[in-house]
Amino acid sequence: MESLTLQPIARVDGAINLPGSKSVSNRALLLAALACGKTVLTNLLDSDDVRHMLNALSALGINYTLSADRTRCDITGNGGPLRAPGALELFLGNAGTAMRPLAAALCLGQNEIVLTGEPRMKERPIGHLVDSLRQGGANIDYLEQENYPPLRLRGGFIGGDIEVDGSVSSQFLTALLMTAPLAPKDTIIRVKGELVSKPYIDITLNLMKTFGVEIANHHYQQFVVKGGQQYHSPGRYLVEGDASSASYFLAAGAIKGGTVKVTGIGRKSMQGDIRFADVLEKMGATITWGDDFIACTRGELHAIDMDMNHIPDAAMTIATTALFAKGTTTLRNIYNWRVKETDRLFAMATELRKVGAEVEEGHDYIRITPPAKLQHADIGTYNDHRMAMCFSLVALSDTPVTILDPKCTAKTFPDYFEQLARMSTPA
């Protein structure tokens, strides 16, 4: 297996313009495909997840052109639901941001489509979304294991009264929200259970509004969506930088700055993961906010005990930042780490122990006490981009770290290690 050993880093300094947000890129692509008119998307993320969405849209007859660096996409909308040219199978890798929204959108009209993906995708639950779509009339079959992909979709979604379980993934609600305006009937979506990662719903509502559709949100418990609507292209749309990707650089600044400045997100960003910077500030770093930048300057870091439900992806970065904080850090309410690219709670606990940390892994929390000195270890990445990037921070000590399968960062940040090296002074 390929590996990359990062030698100890003495200091991290400088600025980085972030690649586009994965969450925003794939939502914007789907809405542009469903909309009337032509949309020019700029700062689109070039990554595995986005390529899976683009390949699917192409197979569904959507015309687009990409710039040479794949960060600009000119896409001609379909002016309504996507139509398959006959029976179709779409392979979506391990891209949850493609699988969930497409599973809903392709239930409009009378398609016959199979959605499948990598082995890990077949372990990521989708039953709550399927249950909700069926309540709205969708005709869906599980082809292998009940409640998991692959799925066969045969259209039929018309809207109506729908309940969705919000406790596992906010992407199920996102998928329903984006699809419901195109259904023939009005839809009332009721959320049962506590809604996880609420800020991701704000991204969805924000983008829908950009494409001309507004819906009534009653305290995130009930959403009322008028049927028979159309999305309209905003013309040009700039995808903001990926706030989850920013977390690694901001954390590096907190641990071994200098000052690290990330551009492409800021106080005006719609992504909830910008709140990661507040957590670093609580731990002792100095944060400066601009409209389109966040800067982090090194501070004396101390442990925290916090509910991380609002920033589940960026919270992983706090788990490795905790190795440099005084005391025991506890991250709570993070059950949904278990249904991501891998079981991130198990993976994080396992790999933190390898570098010498004392770790308690709970059902929905993790408690981390750093060692006096970090140990050099081979870090398993579980084909999970965030595991690879989180553990790169171990090199901000006097100990090297070896990352196995480093190319898994291609899911959101193909040149991550090059960018980190550019801003680093070796010890």
From Swiss-Prot:
Give residues annotated as binding phosphoenolpyruvate: K22, G96, R124, Q171, R344, R386, K411
* Function field: Catalyzes the transfer of the enolpyruvyl moiety of phosphoenolpyruvate (PEP) to the 5-hydroxyl of shikimate-3-phosphate (S3P) to produce enolpyruvyl shikimate-3-phosphate and inorganic phosphate.
Q: Which reaction does it catalyse?
A: 3-phosphoshikimate + phosphoenolpyruvate = 5-O-(1-carboxyvinyl)-3-phosphoshikimate + phosphate
Gene that encodes the chain: aroA
Record pathway: Metabolic intermediate biosynthesis; chorismate biosynthesis; chorismate from D-erythrose 4-phosphate and phosphoenolpyruvate: step 6/7
Mind naming one GO cellular-component term on file for this protein?
cytoplasm
The GO terms describing molecular function are:
3-phosphoshikimate 1-carboxyvinyltransferase activity
**Family recorded in the similarity comment:** Belongs to the EPSP synthase family.
Q: Does the keyword Cytoplasm apply?
A: yes
Localization, UniProt = Cytoplasm
Entry-linked PANTHER family:
AROM/DEHYDROQUINATE SYNTHASE, PENTAFUNCTIONAL AROM POLYPEPTIDE
Q: List GO BP terms, alphabetically.
A: amino acid biosynthetic process; aromatic amino acid family biosynthetic process; chorismate biosynthetic process
**What keywords were assigned to this record?**
Amino-acid biosynthesis, Aromatic amino acid biosynthesis, Cytoplasm, Transferase
Annotated protein name in UniProt: 3-phosphoshikimate 1-carboxyvinyltransferase
* Entry binding sites for 3-phosphoshikimate: K22, S23, R27, S169, S170, Q171, S197, D313, N336, K340
In short, the EC number is 2.5.1.19
Give the positions the UniProt entry annotates as the active site: D313
> Known SUPFAM superfamilies for this protein?
EPT/RTPC-like
> What InterPro entries does the record point to?
Enolpyruvate_Tfrase_dom, Enolpyruvate_Tfrase_sf, EPSP_synthase, EPSP_synthase_CS, RNA3'P_cycl/enolpyr_Trfase_a/b
